[in-house]
Swiss-Prot record:
Protein name: Chaperone protein DnaJ
Cofactor: Zn(2+)
Cell compartments where the protein resides: Cytoplasm
Family matches, as InterPro entries: DnaJ, DnaJ_C, DnaJ_domain, DnaJ_domain_CS, HSP40/DnaJ_pept-bd, HSP_DnaJ_Cys-rich_dom, HSP_DnaJ_Cys-rich_dom_sf, J_dom_sf
Length: 371
């Protein structure tokens, strides 16, 4: 093959990067030693990789175009860039392109040492009245916060962070084993892709420290049991200036002595006298906001009936709509009656029996069974 890199790849000197890559992949697959029996395949494969290694780099390509092939090669040799070392670097690149082409993967890009902080979860218990009105709660927890000495950079004041020269900022190195490559964390930068020559003494180069925090969180009115509220950026600080995680506050509402919650509706047991149940009337009932309202009891109300107070339940979160309060009637029978009350009830009993005897209903049907 000709030593002209453009001719090796079969492209013109004005070829775009996309055209270069397309030509490179086609030839690399054709001449890869593991995919062909051609005796000259390995030599051709090395030439293809050397050509692409230069032309894919805009600075190297510009130098190659300016000085020509021979001068460029001599300069590379004096700079210590042997062809054997370049070949191993390039073969790792080709495997990345193979996987990208066939499996949807991609060549690993330089990593950033600015890793995002972890999300945090906080369990907060409130009562039903607090859930109704909404409340501002102060919470305390420990987490990683930005180092106040290096301001999150991880390096001593005035020091700069440099790209790792062992992995080129990728954070990993590759070892070839046959057709496959094994990727492992770079031993020099520990997978960070960057080198801190003089780490901050307080945070040991991490850019963050452990600290107890106090935070005021707003709980909106109408929050339900099990609601998760997200506080963006209030989680753990990121590594070396990375974005902070989020804080998730999980709400638990303690059971109430009077009300049972069903979404935005409230249910409660309402005891009334049998007189009120029979005659009807109005009674005062307490509602969740801490006052009393009138409830009309229809005459003839039965035990277990449900009476609804519209818009007297819980508010719906971030809405002006409220649920209802549903009362479950429980008729109370007096245990201790005065003589006068007993006499009146006896009269009521006689009249009730007389009415049932005359209406030919259930009472007469039962009576006929014994006659």
């Amino acid at each position: 093959m000709s030593q002209d890199y453009y001719k090796i790849l079969g492209v013109s000197k004005t070829a775009s990067q996309a055209d270069l890559k397309k030509a490179y992949l086609k030839l690399a697959k054709q001449y890869h030693p593991d995919t062909t029996d051609d005796k000259d395949a390995e030599k051709k494969f090395k030439e293809i990789n050397r050509a692409y290694d230069v032309l894919k780099d805009e600075q190297k390509r510009a130098a190659y175009d300016r000085f020509g092939h021979d001068t460029f090669q001599n300069q590379q040799s004096r700079g210590g860039g042997g062809s054997h070392a370049g070949f191993h670097h390039d073969i790792n690149d080709i495997f990345g392109d193979f996987f990208s082409d066939f499996m949807g993967g991609g060549r690993r890009k330089p990593t950033s040492s600015k890793a995002r902080g972890s999300d945090l979860k906080y369990d907060l218990t409130i009562n039903l009245e607090e859930a109704f009105h909404g409340i501002e709660k102060n919470i305390s927890f420990s987490s990683e916060v930005k180092c106040d000495t290096c301001h999150g950079s991880g390096s001593e004041k005035g020091e700069t962070v440099t790209t790792c020269d062992a992995c080129g900022g990728v954070g990993a190195t590759r070892i070839q084993q046959g057709f496959f490559t094994i990727e492992q964390a770079c031993h020099k930068c520990k997978g960070n892709g960057q080198i801190i020559k003089n780490p901050c003494k307080k945070c040991h180069g991490m850019g963050r420290c452990h600290k107890q925090r106090n935070l005021s969180v707003n709980i909106p009115a109408g929050v339900e049991n099990g609601t998760r509220i997200r506080h963006t950026g209030e989680g753990e600080a990121g590594i070396r200036g990375g974005n902070s995680g989020d804080l998730y506050v999980d709400i638990a509402i303690t059971p109430h002595d009077i009300y049972k919650v069903d979404g935005a509706n409230l249910h409660c047991k309402l005891p009334i006298s049998f007189v009120n149940a029979a005659l009807g009337g109005e009674i005062e009932v307490p509602v969740i906001e801490g006052r009393k309202v009138n409830l009309t009891i229809p005459a003839g109300t039965q035990n277990g009936d449900q009476l609804r107070l519209r818009s007297k339940g819980m508010p719906k979160m971030r809405s002006t709509i409220r649920g209802d309060m549903i009362t479950h009637i429980h008729i109370e029978v007096p245990k201790n009656l005065s003589k006068r009350q007993c006499e009146l009830l006896e009269e009521f009993k006689k009249e009730s029996i007389s009415e049932k005897e005359n209406d030919g209903s259930f009472f007469n049907k039962m009576k006929s069974l014994w006659s």
